[in-house]
Amino acid sequence: MRLGLDLAHLENPIANSPGLIDVKPRLRYLRDAATSIAASWFSLCGLSVGLPVEPAVYDLLVAMPDGIKRVQVKTTTCYAKDGWTVVVGRRPYSVGNRERRVPYDPELIDWFFIVDGNLTIYLIPSRVIAGRISILLRTYTKYIVGNAAGLMAGQLAVA
């Protein structure tokens, strides 16, 4: 109290919230966060984004200047001696999801939005990787469109 005034309501409620400082982004949640990262990136580009209401082969619909585009979102935290490897294939719908992976049909997907373990963002036309089930991202550096590493608050929290 100062001058008889209660100033408690002016305190920072976040700073006084128990447990909030223990919340840290972790790469193990990248797969869960990737669609939101993609939607945010497209929105920051001034494009409208939609999510499919029913299960679809794509994760996002994006209104681009040349029409609605279907975007499949992929992530990788698999770093090998040659660089980041990402699976760009899918499993056909089956009981137990045990079928072998198959490539996406480039007639059904227009773009792949890929986020690697460094949070580097790639936007790759589906026709460029058509027929492949996995790719080595270092061969696609010309498709890098950004980086979301700032979400990690200056450090990567592994595991």
Describe the role of every protein-language-model region.
Residues M1-G4:
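Nuclease-adjacent, charged terminal/linker segments that flank catalytic cores
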Residues L7-L51:
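Acidic-basic catalytic patches of nuclease active cores, encompassing PD-(D/E)XK
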Residues P18-L20, K24, G67-V71, D105, ...:
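Short alpha-helical elements
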Residues F42, L60-V62, G67-T75:
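Conserved catalytic cores of phosphodiester-cleaving nucleases, focusing on short active-site segments
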Residues S48-A56, A63-P65:
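Active-site metal-binding core of divalent-cation-utilizing nuclease and nuclease-like domains
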Residues A56-Y58, L119-T120:
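Loop/turn residues immediately N-terminal
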Residues K74-I121:
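Catalytic cores of nucleic-acid endonucleases
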Residues L119, I124-A159:
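Non-catalytic C-terminal interaction segments of nucleic acid-processing enzymes
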